[in-house]
Curated annotation (Swiss-Prot):
InterPro entries: GPCR_Rhodpsn, GPCR_Rhodpsn_7TM, TAAR, TAAR_fam
Alphabetical list of Gene3D superfamilies matching this protein: Rhodopsin 7-helix transmembrane proteins
Region (Extracellular Loop 2 (ECL2)): 175-188
Organism listed in the record: Rattus norvegicus
Family according to the record: Belongs to the G-protein coupled receptor 1 family.
GO MF: 2-phenylethylamine receptor activity; G protein-coupled amine receptor activity; trace-amine receptor activity
GO cellular component, one term: plasma membrane
Keyword list, A-Z: Behavior, Cell membrane, Disulfide bond, G-protein coupled receptor, Glycoprotein, Membrane, Receptor, Transducer, Transmembrane, Transmembrane helix
Subcellular location: Cell membrane
Protein name: Trace amine-associated receptor 4
Pfam families for the chain: 7tm_1
Parts of the chain on the Extracellular side: 1-37, 91-110, 171-197, 282-296
Amino acid sequence: MNSPDLWYSPETQFCFAAANNSCPRKARPALVVCAMYLVMIGAIVMTMLGNMVVIISIAHFKQLHSPTNFLILSMATTDFLLSCVVMPFSMVRSIESCWYFGDLFCKVHSCCDIMLCTTSIFHLCFISVDRHYAVCDPLHYVTQITVGVVGVFLLISWSVPILFAFGLVFSELNLIGAEDFVAAIDCTGLCVLIFNKLWGVLASFIAFFLPGAIMVGIYIHIFTVARKHARKIGPGPRTKRALSESKMKATSGKESKATKTLSIVMGVFVLCWLPFFVLTITDPFIGFTTPEDLYNVFLWLGYFNSTFNPIIYGMFYPWFRKALRMIVTGTIFRSDSSTSSLHPAHP
C-alpha cells in the first residue's frame, strides 16, 4: 500500500492539525465524499439488517433448527459483526484517509478484520463438507453430521481465526523485514495493515487459498455425484420401489437446490475476496506501491460479500422470504410463531 505523501504543499490538510507528525488528509471533492459515504453506509445498513433477518429467522423458527442452518446462523453472525465492528471504522479511514480512533484500537480493528474474514471462509468450508455428506451420502447424513459435529465445526471456525489474527497482529510477525518502510510512513492518524513477503503469502494461503481450494474440490465432486444420481433415477412403474425412488428424487432435488445456492454463496465470496488476497501477496514484492484507492476498492469489494449473502438467501430460499414477511409485519411476535411452517415438508 502506498505511503502517505511526505511532501506537503501549503494547502495540505492534516488528520490532526495540532500534531507535529500528523498524516495528511486525502483531498476529495465534496460530491465524491458524499457519494462514498452514501454507498458505504448503505452497504453497512444492508449488511446489518440482512444478516439480522437470517439470525432472527434461524434462532426463532424451530423448523429451521438443523445442522446446516446452525452453520448459516453462525456465518450470518460473523457478517453481522463485520458490519458493526469493522466496516464503520474502515469507512471513515477509507474516505478521510485518517484514523481517529487511537493506536490500540487500530490493532484491535485489524485483528477483527482478519478474524471475521477468516471465520467467514472457514464457515463456508465446513458448509461445503455438510453439503458433501447431504448429497453424496444422504443415508448416513443424519448420523454423521450431528449437532455435536457442527459444534466442533463452529469451535474450529471461531477459535483458529481468533488465535491467528490476534497472535499475528500483536506479535507483529507480519512487520519483520518491513521495519524501514513502516518507519518511513509513520505518522499520527495512520492505520494500515502491512504484511511482509512471508506473511503476505502465508496469511493469504491460510485464510483464503487453502480453504477456498478445498471448497472448490468438494463442490466439483458434489455436482459430479448429483448428476450421476439424476441419471440413475428414471421413470418406472408405481411400485413401492418406484415410490421410494420418487421420494429419493424429491430429497435429492431439495439437497441439490440447497447445494447450488450455497455454491453461489461460495462463488460470490471467492469473486469478492480474490482481488484483495492477490494484492496482499503481491504488494510486498512491488515495494508496497499499490495505490491507496485501489487497496480500498478491493477491501470494500470483500466487505460487500457480507452484504450479498442475505440477498442470495432471499433469492433462493423461500423460508427466508417468508420469515422476512413475518418479521416486517410483526407476525413473529405471536406466541405460536416459532412453530410456523416456513417451507413445505417433503413426503
